[in-house]
Amino acid sequence: MWARKALSTWLSLILLGLASSRAAYGQSVLEYHGSPGRSGSFVVPYLTWERARGIHREVAFQPQFSGHLYAQPLFWQPAEMLIVATEDDTVYAIDVSSGNEIWKRVLGRPVPLSTQPCGNIDPLGITGTPVIAEGTQAIYLDAMVEEASGPHHKIFALSLRDGSPLPGWPVDVADALAARGQLFDSVVQNQRGALTVLAGRVYVPYGGHAGDCGDYHGWVVGVGLRNPQDIVSWSTRGQGGGIWAPGGIAADGRSLFFATGNTIGVSTWSDGEAVFRLAPDLRRETRSQDFFAPSDWPTLDAQDADLGGTNPLPLDVPFSRGTAALVLALGKDAHAYLLDRDHLGGIGGSLASKIVSTGSIHTAPATFTVGEDVFVAFQGRGADCPVPSPDNALTVLQISIGTSPSLATVWCGAFQGAGSPIVTTTDGHSNPIVWILGAEGDDRLHGYRGDTGEPLFAGGGPRDTMPGLRHFQDLLATRDRLYIGADDRLYAFSF
């Protein structure tokens, strides 16, 4: 089961693929963590271990915008621009080199916290990381918009050229689902997970607000990239079960993977505390190969110990007879679960499980390889750190097969904050560096050798601090810079 800036310039860049007169900034970063699989792995040829020691913040790079920023910025290489979507319901295109604004698009009025039934984002606008579809040359995102009738979740498709909405967009989620006989209450639903694209549709995950108020459910809504009337959906049977992890939905080219949080007031399993695999049509399946939930899901529900705190991470792990197609799930219950990607296992059917942290895990993991070995980095205090320290807040696991799948902690890193890690290598394997932000902690960038955990960059000097980082925030890697989004501005680090 395992194996297996002007318009002419714009058109020239897109259609003819002409080289820019400025330095190339590497491949586009179209979605969260750089790939549908949410690997968080970036190839940066010149970022060796030695050069990482001299990385520094470019104080002259000071693009500014309006709004709190929870979503990861994106990078569109043909026009050499960064895309930033903020809680002010505004999307900006920013020149990757100068930091100058190329265009901006205001999508509506965000929703103030004072009018929300619960929550912790004020105001609430665009939270989940958008996705870029190369085929339509558009950015897709969900925005919470305040109107006379109340708050509305709207899915937008914006032209990369100037930010204008494509014909037929936006889609009002509640209205679109009501036309299909389904109830979606925008007041109690929140959208913070990253979007993805698969098989001609954009997929948007929904959960509830912080505080679990109201009759919300976990939802996935798919909308045709070229036909916004083409809508498919899936929702949890029980109340709750939100899909709220910052990584949102992962995809492996065939299927969608996501994790749900705690359900509320259920006596039988009703889709909470689970990892799901769905086909692009989002058809509900009840086969054990299409979902996994820990056997103690009632306890997790009662303790609000969501399995849905991180996105599932597809992994391909070499072993003696080929390659194992796995999924790693990490939970607020501090467990890691290894699953067979082709047969998730139903209730209690993991291949391996282990307590890997001394506290909750609820950011996005990243994966990388060293030789034939597969590693996963996550923000959390490791339960089995080789060198114990009260400051350890980054943990790296090795995933092995052997006679059976297993997980082991190989190193831990000390820093203060709650960012999500990424990994850079120079060629896909060499010079692995795990980068993480001290978001809502020391507000600094930290880098570690991926193979040993040796600190390479420990935050720098006074000019390298980054006020305004929001929890769960991660980095964006291009050819010669690392970019970080924060409230009202972007930061860039050069090497």
PLM regions with names:
Residues 1-5:
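N-terminal secretory signal peptides that target proteins for export/translocation
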Residues 8-19:
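Bacterial N-terminal signal peptides
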Residues 21-26:
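Sec/Tat signal peptide C-region and signal peptidase I cleavage site
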Residues 27-319, 324-346, 360-385, 392-397, ...:
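Mobile, glycine-rich extracellular loop/lid and propeptide segments
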Residues 351-353, 390-425:
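A beta-strand-loop signature enriched in Asp, Gly, Thr, and Trp
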